[in-house]
Amino acid sequence: MSEVKLLGIEEIEQEVFTRWDITGHQVNRHMLSKALTGTEGVVLDQITFPPGFVHHMHRHPHADMVVIPLSGVVQFLGVPGSPIEVSPGHVLVIPRGNWHEISNVGTVDSEVLHFFTGVGAVDDIGYEAYQQQGQAAPPLGGGR
């Protein structure tokens, strides 16, 4: 039997995350995973998206994604679709395999709880950047 754990969010180390398909950076606190806490079937991060942040169009083939804003507003864009503002009081559910882009078009940081379900480790989520005819992902609001 696993033991009960009480985690202080401020005690969890922050990781500044950048990559070729991200405009700006995000700040992650890895909170739940099989390796960290013994939880199976869910990966949970607290993520801060600074103003101007964009994680360009991509998908996760092996995990459903859930985003719960704690502060600020994030903008979600699917393919096809129109931008949707997601703010505190909302729960955004993105089923596995769905193309999506998330950005902070506001003037203050957006902080979210970010879950992947059906997996116990980040490496199991799967990741594919959006490519069409050799082009990079479309910009937010790019009409796809």
Language model segments and positions:
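A short hydrophobic beta-strand segment most commonly corresponding to one strand
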Residues: Q46-I47, V93, V108-D124
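A short, N-terminal "cap"/entry segment at the start of jelly-roll beta-barrel domains
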Residues: M1-V42, H56, Y127-R144
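Asparagine-centered strand-capping/turn motif at beta-strand->loop junctions
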Residues: S103-G106
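Short, conserved beta-strand element in jelly-roll/cupin
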Residues: I47-P50, R59-F76, F115-G118
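A short beta-loop-beta micro-motif enriched in histidine and acidic residues
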Residues: K34-V43, P51-V66, P80
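Short acidic-glycine-tyrosine-enriched beta hairpin
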Residues: P80-R96
